[in-house]
């Protein structure tokens, strides 16, 4: 935690896309470059390689040689994929790094594995009321012999 996005945990914490800045040299920070690249990587994970490439192609078609914003990039990803990434924009707007609490349990009799993830984002200077951020990640289950097991989400039963 202290090695990844250390700036996010200190008094200089700021969003990837700050609302304002004192001078442009203040804009070249670890948060903007390192965390910003991780946010782009999460969009890649969320959309998958094909839709991400489609979004990248659209982005360059629209904005080649122009000064752009993160909103231009996200909009191209939305338009190319048909996905609404408005909740994902919080990664650009909020400072701080989400902290996850993970709990898991396996009900052997029912054959059910439960994974519960809770998210909190510590207060940072100027931002105390944080909204949960979308964190894409992949999960899978393996059997005793290392084989992949079918995964069925509890939400699938609600249909």
Regions found by a protein language model. Name each.
Residues 84-87, 95-159:
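Beta-strand-rich binding/interaction modules
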Residues 1-104, 115:
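Hydrophobic alpha-helical and helix-loop surface patches within well-folded domains
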